């Protein structure tokens, strides 16, 4: 078995794309293939790509069909689907190492579906399963058709530049369910270790590991540390060679360290989308009613979306303003081209007609870029329209304002929110109350009873709250939310919400068509609100571990376990005098939360990292990325 060597690019997404491109070129370096005279004439080799569900999720999150074609993939199919023979081309199998998958591969080869097979397992195949694979190939006389078997270490999904998911559902439920037996917990811990090991291989450097003691995070940390030690001892792969870059810190945390970000009503673009629309693996589903029929539109986000790249983490009113500005810029650029070419619209522009005019040809050459820009802006206009409708229907601006000043609310304000028939869904109200309940020091029993009665009377079921009541004291002890707040994106007051006004003015007809009225009323409720970025608990923990000397939270993380896969033993900072030298600063961190992650936390960490001087890099991920509704459902299942 072998690990495909990779360089260390500027982001996890770029690193994973490099690894996938190498996989698509039969585990040969793409740059070498393109530059070598010996191979250039035959590049790319045409081939078939076969994947399972996990492989499909990994690829589709970072590559498009055009990217697959660029690397010679003419056909891509699921391994469980019916497939016709394509006997004269090789097949790449990108699948999980399971009994079912190896049997399906052997079945394909026995039928002669493809010329040869390049088998790329997304994670490490066990020795027992590998031996069984070899035995099946021998029995069916297909061994000669298997040209490669690789452990690719790609069993995770990248959603943003430095944002990943291990795609392991229900981890929170498993770790907090009293009926989960030891075998199940150990199995899930091993799944997490396998996924994190793959992320580390892709990044090409061995981290120093920190985690709280006596937790599920420690179980993962210990097993991952041993896995890395064994790998360092037994292999000489490129990713463990001398690396001039400083080693990162890997911070492992349990979800119970802070439950609030999972259910917050956020005001940032990407978090609002994840909360109010169906967003899975960078595909957004927008439902609308056209001619009395419910229709669905799908929008795919990718790394080439310039608007998403620069606006995803911004407050939604600022995003609305930026849509307006970008559309104005597009119209000005389009008008310039039509003016120079003497036509009334871009559709009338004939590129061939200007072949002899360098001046006009230069202007017309911008046409493809303009068309792509317009498609992206139209997509975000439609998404913004759907968000505005959700904000109006659920009064999300009210919840955002209440939660922004959650500890300042009194009993009457809380009951008023719960009892307001026009404000939010029952789940919105329960989320709001749980956030308040986790934010205050104590709640009198009589008050709690009154709140619960009000919640039930307004359609709420209390299963999620019952679970939170059990873990409240643990969560309260670990919450380190900083009292320091900073203006979000440098915008304040009316200036921030000017985007709503311009959007309302410019696209009134579009909103009316979508059934959205009274946009000004939505704006007026938040016009005087100054959104501040508060360093959440996990951001405070990360700061204390990356830069111990500058964080007031450092004392609360001193007891965290410190594991160095390159060292012989584990130590904690506060119980070993020699560990004092380990209080080093880090420029890069990998942060993984066990039991669910979210876009709000990712954005908060990214904002903090950008503000540092010099800037820091943080890669954030989780066992699974959950919307507030999904996490509420998981908590309810534990009541």
From Swiss-Prot:
Signal sequence region: none
Designated name of the protein: Protein sly1
Keyword Cytoplasm (UniProt): yes
Chief location: cytoplasm
Pfam family, one: Sec1
GO BP annotations, alphabetical order: endoplasmic reticulum to Golgi vesicle-mediated transport; intracellular protein transport; retrograde vesicle-mediated transport, Golgi to endoplasmic reticulum; vesicle docking involved in exocytosis
Subcellular location: Cytoplasm
Organism of origin: Schizosaccharomyces pombe (strain 972 / ATCC 24843) (Fission yeast)
GO molecular function, one term: syntaxin binding
Superkingdom of source: Eukaryota
Disulfide cysteine pairs (residue numbers): none
Gene: sly1
Gene Ontology CC terms, in alphabetical order: cytosol; Golgi membrane
Keywords of this entry: Cytoplasm
Entry similarity comment: Belongs to the STXBP/unc-18/SEC1 family.
């Amino acid at each position: 078995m072998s690990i495909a060597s990779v360089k260390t690019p500027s982001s996890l997404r770029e690193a994973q794309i490099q690894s996938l491109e190498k996989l698509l070129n039969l585990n040969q370096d793409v740059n070498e293939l393109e530059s070598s005279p010996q191979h250039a004439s035959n590049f790319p080799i045409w081939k078939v790509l076969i994947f399972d569900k996990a492989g499909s999720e990994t690829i589709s999150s970072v590559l498009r069909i055009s990217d697959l074609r660029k690397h010679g993939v003419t056909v891509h199919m699921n391994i469980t689907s019916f497939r016709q023979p394509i006997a004269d081309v090789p097949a790449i199998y990108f699948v999980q190492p399971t009994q079912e998958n190896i049997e399906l591969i052997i079945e394909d080869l026995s039928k002669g579906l493809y010329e040869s097979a390049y088998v790329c397992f997304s994670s490490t195949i066990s020795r027992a399963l590998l031996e069984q694979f070899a035995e099946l190939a021998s029995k069916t006389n297909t061994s000669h058709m298997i040209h490669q078997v690789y452990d690719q270490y790609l069993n995770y999904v990248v959603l943003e530049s430095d944002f990943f998911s291990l795609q392991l559902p229900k981890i929170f439920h498993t770790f907090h369910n009293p009926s989960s037996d030891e075998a199940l917990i150990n199995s899930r811990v091993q799944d997490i270790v396998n996924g994190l090991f793959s992320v580390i291989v892709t990044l090409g450097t061995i981290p120093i590991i920190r985690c709280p003691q006596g937790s599920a995070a420690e179980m993962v940390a210990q097993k991952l540390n041993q896995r890395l030690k064994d790998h360092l001892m037994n292999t000489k792969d490129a990713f463990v060679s001398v690396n001039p870059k400083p080693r990162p810190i890997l911070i492992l945390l349990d979800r119970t360290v802070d439950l609030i970000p999972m259910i917050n009503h956020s005001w940032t673009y990407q978090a609002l989308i994840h909360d109010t629309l169906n967003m899975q693996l960078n595909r957004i589903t927008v439902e609308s009613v056209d001619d009395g029929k419910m229709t669905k539109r799908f929008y795919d986000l990718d790394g080439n979306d310039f608007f998403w790249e620069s606006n995803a983490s911004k407050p939604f009113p600022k995003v609305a303003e930026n849509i307006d500005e970008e559309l104005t810029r597009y119209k000005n650029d389009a008008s310039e081209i039509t003016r120079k070419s003497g036509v009334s619209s871009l559709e009338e522009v004939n590129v061939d007609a200007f072949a002899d005019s360098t001046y006009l040809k230069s202007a017309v050459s911008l046409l493809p870029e303009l068309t792509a820009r317009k498609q992206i802006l139209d997509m975000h206009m439609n998404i913004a329209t759907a968000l505005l409708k959700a904000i109006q229907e659920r009064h999300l601006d009210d919840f955002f304002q209440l939660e922004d000043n959650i500890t300042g609310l009194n009993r009457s304000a809380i009951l008023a929110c719960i009892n307001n028939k026009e404000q939010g869904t029952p789940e919105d109200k329960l989320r709001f109350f749980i956030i308040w309940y986790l934010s205050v020091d104590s709640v009198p029993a009589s008050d709690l009873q009154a709140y619960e009665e009000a919640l039930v009377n307004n359609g709420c079921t209390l299963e999620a709250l019952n679970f939170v009541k059990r873990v409240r004291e643990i969560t309260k002890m670990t919450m380190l939310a900083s009292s320091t707040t900073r203006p979000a994106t440098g915008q304040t007051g009316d200036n921030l919400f000017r985007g709503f006004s311009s959007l309302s003015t410019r696209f009134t007809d579009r909103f009316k068509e979508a059934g959205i009225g009274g946009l000004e009323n939505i704006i007026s409720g938040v016009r005087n609100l100054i959104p501040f970025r508060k360093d959440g608990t996990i951001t405070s923990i990360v700061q204390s571990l990356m830069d111990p000397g500058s964080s007031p939270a450092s004392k609360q993380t001193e007891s965290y376990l410190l594991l160095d896969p390159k060292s012989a033993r584990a130590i904690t900072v506060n119980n070993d005098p020699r560990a004092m030298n380990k209080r080093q600063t880090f420029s890069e961190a990998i942060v993984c939360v066990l039991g669910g992650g979210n876009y709000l936390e990712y954005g908060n960490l990214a904002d903090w990292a950008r503000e540092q001087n010099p800037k820091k890099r943080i890669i954030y991920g989780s066992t699974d990325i959950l919307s507030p509704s999904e996490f509420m459902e998981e908590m309810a299942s534990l009541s």
